[in-house]
Amino acid sequence: MSEFGNGYKWSQAAVKGLLLALITIVCNTITYIFPGSTIVSLLAFIVRTVASIWLLVTFMKQYAATTGENPMSFALCTVLLSSLVCAFYDAAAIAWLFPSLMGQIDEAMTQSLSMMPAEGQGIMERMMDHYPRIAFFSTFIKDFIFGLIVAAIANSSTRKKDIFDDEGKQEEDELA
C-alpha cells in the first residue's frame, strides 16, 4: 500500500462523488422544472451521461497518478457516494421539492390504471403511497450499476501493464 491510506481514498471519493452527483442533480432539476419538454429532457440526459463518464474517468486518472494505485476501489467508493446523494435528491425532489412532479406521476398512473384489472389497481394505488422510497432505491441501484460499469471499462482501458515487473520474472523462473 502506498503512503496514502483509506482515509485519503474516502475523503477524495466523498469530494469527487459530490461533484459527480452535482451534475446529475442539476440535469434532473432542469428536467423537473421543464417537465413537458422532450428536447430539454433529452439534452439534459445527454449532458448528464457524457459529463458523468468524463468526470469519473478523469477522477480515476487523477487518483492513479497521485497514489500510484489501481483506481478501481476509489472509483467504487466515488460511485457509491455519488449514487447515495443522487438517490436522496430524487426522493426529496419527488416528496417535497417538486410536489407537482408527484401529481404528474399520479396522473399518469391513474390513466394506466383504467386498463388494469381491479387487483392490479389496488397494488398500484398502494405503491404510489411509497413512491419516494421506490424512487430512492431504484435511482441508487441504477446509478451505482451504471457507475460500476463505467469504472470497470475505464479501469481496463487505462491500466498499463509493465512488462519489466518482478511478477513476470517470477512466473518465468517457475516455468523453467
Where would I find each of the regions flagged by the language model?
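Transmembrane alpha-helical insertion/packing segments
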Residues: 1-62
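Alpha-helical transmembrane segments of multi-pass membrane proteins
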Residues: 11-19, 73-86
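Alpha-helical transmembrane segments of multipass membrane proteins
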Residues: 23-31, 48-52, 82-90, 146, ...
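Membrane-helix interface/capping segments
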Residues: 59-73
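Functional transmembrane-helix hotspots
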Residues: 88-115
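Short membrane-interface loop/juxtamembrane segments of multi-pass integral membrane proteins
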Residues: 111-131
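Transmembrane alpha-helical segments in integral membrane proteins
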Residues: 132-163
